[in-house]
């Protein structure tokens, strides 16, 4: 029986950060879908502009606002909802729900908490209350105690005895948690742990070294009926955060007795916290007996529940929403099968493996060991008929330039080096295990070091035996067995040094959650060589295959999933079937009902061609999924695949630096001068010729990694030495650094005309566009230059016969220079679309599928008119990346983004900046310092001083009070600094200050231009006494904005 609610406010999770990523876009989207089905109006508050959920496909109303109590209260006051869902936006949403409840805001406006009651949430998230609850119901917990001060925590640690693990209350991604083996180590990290807890509380617990970590996903309804949907087993033992662990589903090493015992405990945990909806229960099991402990529970959708949904095909978030609004399990149907109720526990005839992906190369001084705190950026999930195959696929999906039995495996080095990596817990455990076994380590040796169950090590040993046999005697029978166990053609060719003849075809299998026990029609598919026949017939209707974005990493995030889902919607609206190929368990695109067929598979040339042969689509879309899909464009075209949109040949011309440069020369379009050097001496000589400053990028490095600005010869030499090798095989590109204003155009072309949006960066040149704060409409560019960048954009579209979405980046110093052209969707396209109220992916569908843009405007190019100011801000995850030095440069380091719109620019800027964690406006003090752009920093300090804020500075006369570095450090530790504003790169001078700010959640502004803009916006808000504008997205789209903006934007009417 449904609860009587007609309007529900849903709290999102905000920007993507380490520990709180796209899994909440997926779960939130499912929740919105379930509400719409029930005819309940949904009001979503989430500043994450890049997600699917902040568009009207799913939500009825969308507010791009900071996730802070005062903003949510304003939305509640305005919208008057009668219910609130807080279990679908990660820790952020749960904490906000508790805060709204405790401040009496929910009672004041009569808003019901749907799902698990707030008392239950507190029993789960407050470590002390959780321990008491477990003891009360007779469930075992490890020896532990809660502390409210560092001194108390030290006493508890001493009484329990080292080693201990410290867990933080009301927190996500294990932030601030640590393992200490001594008092000295404990004292070093305890202050940071308290800073990362919203309620300043930690739990000190006995460290269960070498115990197995097991997770259950439990669904429970208001009547107390429960289902254990899946049991996931962590390959890594206790002490490694589950988000950092390799996870296998279903569990592989539990006996039936152990499984039933832990399942029973998980259901009792759900009962004890009065869970309504979905929760995740983590348990520790002794490897030597049946002793176990309950570790923790999350009474909400989590990373593990997104994974569990994709592992089993059981739509957890959708079912959890229905339970929250009052249904019981037996009243709900499992929408995947269509024939069983939600009370059926899924049964699997395959195995799924999740492996995280790290991006440590992009961060300086970062601690690379993995442990109790999350540092991974994304994750992959592989499905196989056997564990060997699933392990192999998962490593390929990470897209790290190697495979499980690949180049690293074959490189010779001392065994001790590899064992040392295993001891330090460095990423990509399976690759180190395989290499150690090849170099002579035994299963026992590896088990002793890693505490990984021998069962998993034996699986890797099987692969190593096959690999070594392939090197010696590659028979046809052996190659066939290697394919069954997940070896790719590339691996086999590397080992045998001969081409693989395609003699066998893989089969397509479906996931029905029932292990084939009941007939069920599902479209959730995977491909394997370990099978005899296809589970589904070859498709008969015309279809289009869309390649997804694959694993998220820095630079590739939910923006590309937004593009994939929007393009797929456009295909299906046109009556054509759409198939998606993707393997990211966190995303909306890998939701089985987003497409007509979902291939949960690797995005490699070999696998795309297998699926292309089976699916026989009318074309393949590679431009929506970002770099991974786009980089296959030319290879696919060469293999005879029909690509939709811009040709693979054109993509290659834009991607290849030398070819693109020649093209710009031919068209007479200015570009920063650049050269390619094959030795350090040549690089020094050529850099002198084009004059400093220069941007240096070694060519053999992935994803814009290792790009730096060198201001003089010494910096250039230092950097090239760091780059390890510069040679004819690894030339280094050196281009003139032009310190101007950066701008870009997000556009769509049908080959005849171009339509799009201009974006201006607030930070100066030399900061990666993904780390820049962007504003639209532009504010400081001249009319002449804006007209010129549009002309250039049109010329490039015409020359390269662009059909579909693309993005051009410029630096403007008196005149525009082209920096790069991306012939695909860009990171900023969701922002461009939502800031103007026009979906660029729908326009892309017009260009690609209908053959022309239907915009009803004559001329070559046209800018979509602005409806409001839009500001997009980057979200960094410095707090999670222990030791990393926070700074901005030509290499991207942010993990997510947020945005806000406003009638006034200042309002949009402040709301956008406040949507980034841990930003708060300064009340009494600011530390402002730097060794470059001093005039801008001085102006910033002056404005804040005039507003009554005390400004401090180190090593100069920027703020009103000059203090020593040590004084600054002490003030930060004592909580006496509200905000830190600095600029540039000065690791040898201020590493401790910046790192401390990240560790203690002090807002950190890393660019002088942005600091000044924020100071001016704070001044504007103080002087005008303006309240923050609380408007729903559509309210901006349907009304004119401030007259002067209207005139200002119209002064360059781009309809040439």
From Swiss-Prot:
Stretch list, region Carbamoyl phosphate synthetic domain: 537-919
GO CC, one annotated term: cytoplasm
EC number of the protein: 6.3.4.16, 6.3.5.5
Region (Allosteric domain): 920-1056
Binding site for Mn(2+) 4: 820, 822
Residues annotated for ATP 2 binding in this entry: 697, 736, 738, 742, 766-769, 809, 820
Residues bound to Mn(2+) 2: 296, 298
Example of a GO biological process term: glutamine metabolic process
Region Carboxyphosphate synthetic domain, annotated ranges: 1-399
GO terms assigned for molecular function: ATP binding; carbamoyl-phosphate synthase (ammonia) activity; carbamoyl-phosphate synthase (glutamine-hydrolyzing) activity; metal ion binding
Domain ATP-grasp: 131-325, 661-849
Catalysed reactions, as listed in the record: hydrogencarbonate + L-glutamine + 2 ATP + H2O = carbamoyl phosphate + L-glutamate + 2 ADP + phosphate + 2 H(+)
Binding site for ATP 1: 127, 167, 173-174, 206, 208, 213, 239-241, 282, 296
MGS-like domain span: 915-1043
Keyword tRNA processing set for record: no
Associated pathway: Amino-acid biosynthesis; L-arginine biosynthesis; carbamoyl phosphate from bicarbonate: step 1/1; Pyrimidine metabolism; UMP biosynthesis via de novo pathway; (S)-dihydroorotate from bicarbonate: step 1/3
Binding positions for Mn(2+) 3 per the UniProt entry: 809, 820
Subunit structure: Composed of two chains; the small (or glutamine) chain promotes the hydrolysis of glutamine to ammonia, which is used by the large (or ammonia) chain to synthesize carbamoyl phosphate. Tetramer of heterodimers (alpha,beta)4.
Family label: Belongs to the CarB family.
Protein known as: Carbamoyl phosphate synthase large chain
């Amino acid at each position: 029986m449904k609860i009587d609610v007609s309007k529900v406010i849903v709290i999102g999770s905000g920007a993507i950060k380490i520990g709180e990523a796209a899994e909440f876009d997926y779960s939130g989207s499912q929740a919105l879908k379930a509400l719409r089905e029930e005819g309940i109006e949904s009001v979503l508050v989430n500043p994450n502009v890049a997600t699917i959920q902040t568009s009207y496909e799913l939500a009825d109303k969308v507010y791009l606002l900071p996730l802070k109590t005062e903003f949510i209260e304003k939305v509640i006051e305005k919208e008057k909802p009668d219910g609130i869902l807080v279990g679908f936006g990660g820790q952020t949403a749960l904490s906000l729900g508790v805060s709204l409840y405790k401040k009496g805001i929910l009672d004041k406006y009569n808003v019901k908490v749907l799902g698990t009651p707030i008392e239950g949430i507190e029993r789960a998230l407050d470590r002390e209350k959780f321990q008491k609850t477990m003891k009360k119901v007779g469930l075992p917990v490890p020896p532990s105690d809660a502390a409210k001060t560092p001194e108390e925590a030290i006493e508890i640690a001493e009484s329990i005895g080292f080693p201990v693990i410290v867990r933080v209350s009301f927190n996500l991604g294990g932030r601030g948690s640590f393992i200490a083996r001594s008092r000295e180590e404990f004292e070093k990290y305890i202050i940071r742990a308290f800073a990362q807890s919203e309620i300043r509380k930690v739990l000190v617990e006995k460290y269960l070294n070498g115990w197995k970590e097991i997770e259950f996903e439990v669904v429970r309804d208001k009547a107390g009926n429960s289902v254990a949907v899946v049991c996931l087993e962590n390959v890594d033992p206790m002490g490694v955060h589950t988000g950092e662990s390799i996870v296998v589903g279903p569990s592989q090493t539990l006996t039936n007795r152990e499984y039933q015992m832990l399942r029973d405990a998980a259901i009792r945990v759900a009962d004890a916290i009065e869970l309504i909806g979905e929760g995740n229960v983590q348990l520790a099991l002794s490897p030597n007996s049946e002793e176990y402990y309950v570790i923790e529970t999350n009474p909400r959708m989590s990373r593990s529940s997104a994974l569990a949904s994709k592992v089993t095909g059981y739509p957890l978030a959708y079912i959890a929403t229905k339970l929250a609004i009052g249904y019981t399990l037996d009243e709900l149907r499992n929408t995947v099968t269509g024939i069983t109720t939600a009370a059926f526990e899924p049964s699997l005839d395959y195995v799924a493996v999740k492996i995280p992906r790290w991006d440590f190369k992009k961060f300086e001084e970062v601690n690379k060991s993995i442990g109790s705190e999350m540092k991974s950026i994304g994750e992959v999930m592989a499905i196989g008929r056997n564990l060997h195959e699933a392990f192999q696929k998962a490593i390929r999906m990470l897209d790290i330039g190697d495979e499980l039995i690949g180049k690293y495996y074959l490189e010779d080095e001392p065994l001790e080096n590899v064992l040392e990596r295993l001891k330090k817990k460095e990423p990509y455990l399976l690759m180190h295990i395989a290499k150690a076994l090849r170099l002579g380590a035994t299963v026992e040796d590896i088990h002793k070091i890693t505490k990984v169950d021998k069962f998993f090590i034996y699986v890797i040993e099987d692969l190593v035996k096959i690999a070594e046999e392939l090197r010696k005697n590659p028979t046809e029978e052996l190659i066939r067995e290697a394919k069954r166990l997940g070896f790719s053609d590339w691996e086999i060719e590397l080992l045998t040094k001969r081409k693989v003849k395609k003699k066998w075809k893989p089969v397509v299998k479906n996931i029905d959650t029932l292990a084939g026990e009941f007939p069920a029609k599902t479209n959730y598919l995977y491909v394997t060589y370990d099978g005899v026949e296809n589970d589904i017939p070859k498709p008969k209707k015309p279809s289009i295959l869309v390649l997804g974005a694959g694993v998220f990493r820095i630079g590739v995030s939910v923006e590309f999933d937004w593009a994939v889902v929007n393009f797929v919607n456009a295909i299906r609206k046109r009556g054509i079937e759409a198939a998606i190929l993707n393997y990211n368990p966190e995303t909306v695109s890998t939701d089985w009902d987003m497409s007509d067929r979902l291939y949960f598979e690797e995005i490699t040339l070999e696998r795309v061609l297998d699926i292309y042969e089976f699916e026989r689509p009318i074309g393949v879309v590679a431009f929506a999924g970002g770099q991974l899909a786009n980089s296959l464009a030319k290879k696919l075209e060469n293999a005879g695949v029909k690509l939709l949109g811009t040709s693979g040949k054109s993509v290659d011309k834009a991607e290849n630096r030398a070819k693109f440069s020649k093209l710009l020369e031919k068209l007479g379009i200015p570009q920063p001068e650049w050269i390619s050097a094959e030795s350090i001496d040549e690089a020094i000589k050529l850099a002198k010729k084009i004059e400093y400053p220069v941007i240096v990028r070694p060519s053999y490095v992935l994803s814009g990694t290792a790009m730096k600005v060198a201001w003089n010869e010494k910096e250039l030499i230092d950097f090239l030495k760091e780059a390890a090798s510069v040679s004819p095989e690894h030339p280094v590109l050196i281009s003139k650094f032009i310190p101007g204003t950066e701008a870009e155009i997000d556009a769509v072309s049908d080959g005849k005309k171009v339509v799009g949006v201009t974006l201006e960066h607030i930070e100066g040149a030399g900061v990666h566009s993904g780390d820049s704060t962007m504003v639209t409409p532009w504010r400081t560019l001249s009319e002449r230059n804006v007209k010129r960048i549009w002309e250039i954009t049109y010329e490039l579209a015409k020359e390269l016969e662009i059909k579909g979405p693309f993005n051009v980046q410029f630096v403007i110093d008196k005149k525009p220079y082209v920096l790069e052209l991306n012939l695909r969707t860009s990171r900023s396209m969701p922002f461009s679309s939502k800031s103007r109220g026009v979906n660029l992916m729908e326009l892309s569908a017009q260009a690609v599928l209908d053959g022309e843009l239907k915009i009803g405007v004559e001329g070559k190019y046209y800018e979509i008119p602005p409806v409001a100011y839009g500001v997009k801000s980057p979200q960094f995850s410095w707090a999670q990346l222990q030791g990393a030095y926070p700074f901005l440069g030509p290499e991207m380091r942010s993990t997510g983004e947020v945005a806000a719109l406003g009638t006034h620019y200042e309002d949009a800027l402040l709301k956008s900046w406040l949507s980034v964690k841990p930003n708060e406006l300064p009340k009494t003090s600011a530390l402002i310092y730097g060794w470059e752009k001093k005039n801008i920093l001085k102006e910033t300090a002056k404005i804040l001083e005039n507003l009554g804020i005390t400004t401090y500075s180190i090593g100069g006369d920027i703020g009103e009070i000059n203090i020593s570095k040590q004084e600054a450090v002490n003030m930060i530790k004592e909580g006496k600094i509200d905000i830190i504003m600095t600029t540039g790169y000065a690791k040898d001078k201020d590493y401790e200050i910046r790192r401390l700010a990240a560790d203690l959640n002090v807002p950190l502004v890393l660019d002088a231009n942005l600091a000044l803009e924020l100071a001016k916006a704070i001044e504007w808000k103080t002087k005008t006494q303006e309240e923050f504008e609380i408007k729903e997205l559509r309210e901006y789209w349907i009304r004119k904005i401030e007259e002067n903006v209207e005139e200002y934007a119209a002064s360059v009417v781009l309809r040439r």
